[in-house]
Amino acid sequence: MAEFEGGELHYRGKVGTGFDAATAGELLARLEPLREGATAPEGVPREIMREMNWVRPLLSARIHYANRTADNALRHGVFRGLRDVGLSTPVSSTRKRLIAEADLATIWVTNPTRRLFGKTGPTKLDIAVYYALVGDFMLPHILGRPVSLVRCPTGLPKDCFFQRHAFTGMPPSVVTFEATNSEGETKSYLSVEGAKGYLALAQFGVVEFHTWGTHRASLDRPDQIVLDLDPGEGIAWREVVEAAVHIKDELGRLGLVPFAKTSGGSGIHITVPVTGKQNWKKLHQATSAIATHLATTAPDTFTTTMGKDNRKKRIFIDYHRNARGHTSAAPYSLRARTNLPASTPVSWSDLESIDAPQDLNYSSLPGLLATSGDPWAEIDEFARDLPTLRSSS
């Protein structure tokens, strides 16, 4: 067994109980395909190294144990099953193919085996393959929207950076346009306009996509708002889920139809499609009022005040992404951290059943989407007018 610590896998000992012969056979069938390209984790004793067959770290297990040894290995570990994730949304029979076989044939990356975020992390090719596999689901949510990119050209976290403007060698269907930001400054921005450009971005070390809440063709008429639930110190994942469900119910009372996605971290993004009748200033004022109203419905749970000291044991409702030029992680975007979790759209029923959002990642998500479909496929059909509330800000 091994666990991630500081971005690297570290050896945590062996587990020899908790499974019978049938379970062992099932595990072998799951593990055997993962042997190719595997490397040993840090801290493996020499005598163990000689007898082990290593696999790539793509499966998570539930292990019960008594305590840990001085070198942090698990003592008396018992296997309690794999921590699989599943999504229940049925496949849409009308799934639109946006990435053709010819587009897939154009994928090309240099240094395909370069690992990101540590010796046992995913490769540059893994990222290219992920975005190719989820493209039919992701592209409807990003095409034509202003986009910022997070690039990690060396694979080291310290070298990752935001790319908001044009860059050398940019794919043809990633276009630039000029617009004013929230400070009134004219800047050039990016927009992905086709599948080939989207797929080609993997060559440039693109790991994350962040989008505006509007389309390039109607910049001054935002068509969605995002409320980012950011948990403070001492808040567990289950509490964030319960808080999100509370907000869903409150937004429903305001006549809105909210959608949920994991942030790719410890939070949840609640996205609400709107009719685009308001400009950015009025939209930001409206979302400020909505966030303030939501916080008053459960003041011991929520805060709208920025700063870590204000969110201890509480959840910060970040509505500031709803200003001109501000972005949030796009649906199905990977996040540049260990094991590449994805910001994953989920149905509300699925959200309540998820125990470990980080398991929705570059490895697991393509297969889940192939069987479950996109729960946000019809999000635009639920656009509503924003209610008028009085903001205290």
Per-region residue spans from a language model:
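Nucleic-acid 5′ end/cap handling module spanning
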Residues: 1-33, 73, 77-82, 238, ...
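Conserved, mostly hydrophobic/aromatic
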Residues: 1, 131, 227
